[in-house]
Structures are given as structure tokens and as C-alpha cells.
Amino acid sequence: MTKWKRANPNGTRDYLFEECTLIEEVEQKLRRTFLERGYEEIRTPTIEFYDVFAFQSRPIDEEKMYKFFDEKGRIIVLRPDMTIPLARVIGTQRCDTPLKVTYSGNVFRANESLTGKYNEIVQSGIEIIGIDNVRAEIECVISVIQSLQKLKVQSFTIEIGQVQLYKCIVKKLSIHEEEEKVLRTYIESKNYAALSNFIRDKKLDRCDETVKLLEKLPRLFGNLEVIEEAEKLASSNEMKMAITRVKEIYEAIDKLGYGSYISIDLGMIQHLDYYTGVIFKGYIYEIGEEIVSGGRYDELIGNFGEMLPAVGLAVQVNQIVKALQEQQKPYERKRIDIMIHYELNRLAEAERLRNLLQKDGKKVALSLFSNLNDTFQFARKNQIVTVVEAKNESLVEYVWKEKWVVQKEGETSCVTFKLR
């Protein structure tokens, strides 16, 4: 029964000290940027009813959810996604729209073993609800680019795709559901040979404009030249409108001076089926995992109430932290500047002194040791160079200079302070 008590479950890990601080800083900087741009915060429970994720289109595989029972025998899951719970809130609370919201929290998804993916990750994101025009997508992309800039993330790119274009092709060629799943993997992985064989085996007419577009889809990535090529092969107004939307977003972001951060990939297809239009994925050259994902989902909120258009982007905090650790100097944990050693009957004065020194910009901690020599040893081990002893009616300040020497007695060198 104790076989696994010293181990973590597959796909999880512990975060210690400096890394915890860095995760917290990334979350807070993202949150601050989003709030400054007018987003309002929403929090949803870590656990949700299974039914929240089990509507008809099944956007998340059942096998990827962590499931258990509540006290009444109902199936509960650890949330595998942040957007669907937010859709539940918007659909059931009848919030006034348009609405810009931001969130941050852990999501849990059971990935296959040995994939290198974590089953618990931190996501911070934004959603714009109630707006179906291109301004919503533009606002989302600007918000994320600016947040990544403030985090000093280097060499990132946000790719813009269009799942509606792919859906139009599938519909026009009458490709069945099971075949579509196979086709999707070929396009996403840019497996040109397998895609060509698929077209041959399905006996699709290679002279047909839609088939030509399908075969070229995995190759349609880059800048605006990609759009021009796709427009030539678009065989319906719906396809042309889908392509035009990507073009409008790209041009708007480029005019703002952010063109170096974006690219187009019309062969990108999100694995979550609730997306209905423009989709996004962000990458950093140094790491293989995506750091940003999202898109337009105009039909999702209707599963919980009124049908409302919406678009959103999620930032993968863990991947941002990994990138920052690789791109920048190792994160240095802020050391304690001063440690206060105190007699137990002087606790109140010691705490008052700690608060005063902290207001002066110092990082100050109370010693946990009753013996002054133990405090000295701990201070040396943790590179703390100043110890203040609060005893009887006075203060004694010690500074390390190859040994502990009295710097001042009666008050500290930082602030004037007398015990009373």
C-alpha cells in the first residue's frame, strides 16, 4: 500500500523555490497586462461535473479526463480545459456582452506516457465574448504579444490559421467523419506523401480546385503570399471569406509594428473541435511545445445558454517559464537581507522591527532558532550577511566580515529603532 508514497503520478512534478517564484511572477505579469487592457477576472472551480465537457461534439476525449465521484455518486472531473468552464459561466449567468475576461489556473489532462507532456499545467488566458467581427481576434493577438514582450520572451511567433477553411473543404468533398480524422492528422503533421495517397485512394479529382487546395493546404504557411495563393484556389464565397479574415488580422497586426511576431499557417488545425474560425498557436524557437493556443468558438457557449460568438487565447505558463530559464540567466532567488534573532519575550518588538525594515525595501525574516550561534550558522549557510539580535532593552547588529562582528549596538544602521 506504500509502494508509490515517494513518487509523483505520471505527468506531474514538484516545483521548488526559484521556479515557484518565477511561475508566480509570470502569472502576475500576464494578469496585470490583461487587466490594464480592460479584461475582467473570472475564476472557476478546479473540479467540474463531467457533463460540462460531455456535450455532443465531445471536444475533449473522455480518456484524457481525470474522473471520480462526489458524495452523491455523480461523476466529477478535474477540469481538462479552461475555456469550456468559462463558456458555462457566460451561458448560465447571463452576463452583459460584449465582455472581455481573463483567467489563470491549473488544468489536468491525462496524456499518453513517454510523450514528455505534463498532465497538470498552468494556463493564463483571455476571452472576448459577444463580438463576431475581426476586432476581437486582433485585440486578443495584441494583448498576448504585449504580455510576452513584457515578460521579455525572445524569438516567439504566433501562427494564424483558419479551421473554417478546412471544414469547407471537407464538406465540399463529402469526406466522412472517420476519414476526416485521418485526413486531419496528415495535414497537421504536414505528411505530404500520406495526403497524396489519401487523395488517390479516395479517387478525388486532382483537377478540381478544392482538391488542389486540399493538397496544398499543408504547404500554405508563411506571409501574405500564402493568402494570395489560397485565394486563387478558393472555390466558394465561404472559403474566400475565411481566407480574407486571416488576411485582415495579419495586415492589422503588421501595421502596428508586430509583423515579426506573426505568421500564417492555413494547414494548422486545432485538436479541440469547438473552434469554428480563426485559430492561433504560438511557439518559441528554443522549445518544441506551443506556448499559446486558441481561436474563435462561436458555437460553444450555446451548449449552456444563449448562442454567443467568442474568441480567446491561452498562454501556457509552464512553457513560458521553461523558455525564460533557457533564454535568460538562471533565475536567482531573492536572498534574505537581514535576519532578526530575538528573545521570546521580545517577539512583538522583533516583528515591529521586521515590518519597519521591510518597508525600507529590505527582505527580512525572523530567526526560528533559540540559540544565537544557530542563527549565525543558518545565516552563513544562506548568504545572509546581517543579523540583528533583539534582547532585553537593546538591539545588537552583527555583520559578517570573515567572522561575525558587532556593527552597532542600541539601534540598527538601516533605521532608528529602540525596543520598548
Swiss-Prot record:
Residues that span the membrane, as ranges: none
Lineage: superkingdom: Bacteria
Q: Where in the cell is it found?
A: Cytoplasm
Please give the biological process terms from Gene Ontology that the record holds. Answer: histidyl-tRNA aminoacylation; L-histidine biosynthetic process
The cross-references to InterPro entries, in alphabetical order and at most eight, read: aa-tRNA-synth_II, aa-tRNA-synth_II/BPL/LPL, HisRS-like_core, HisRS/HisZ, HisZ
> Which molecular function GO terms apply here?
catalytic activity, acting on a protein; histidine-tRNA ligase activity; transferase activity
The UniProt entry's GO CC annotations, sorted and at most eight, read: cytoplasm
Under which pathway is this protein filed? Amino-acid biosynthesis; L-histidine biosynthesis; L-histidine from 5-phospho-alpha-D-ribose 1-diphosphate: step 1/9
Q: How is the subunit organization of this protein annotated in UniProt?
A: Heteromultimer composed of HisG and HisZ subunits.
Question: PANTHER family per the record?
Answer: ATP PHOSPHORIBOSYLTRANSFERASE REGULATORY SUBUNIT, HISTIDYL-TRNA SYNTHETASE
Which NCBIfam families does the record match to this protein?
Answer: hisZ_biosyn_reg (TIGR00443), PRK12292.1-6 (NF008938)
The role this protein plays is: Required for the first step of histidine biosynthesis. May allow the feedback regulation of ATP phosphoribosyltransferase activity by histidine.
Give the protein family.
Answer: Belongs to the class-II aminoacyl-tRNA synthetase family. HisZ subfamily.
Record-given protein name? ATP phosphoribosyltransferase regulatory subunit
Give me the gene this protein comes from: hisZ
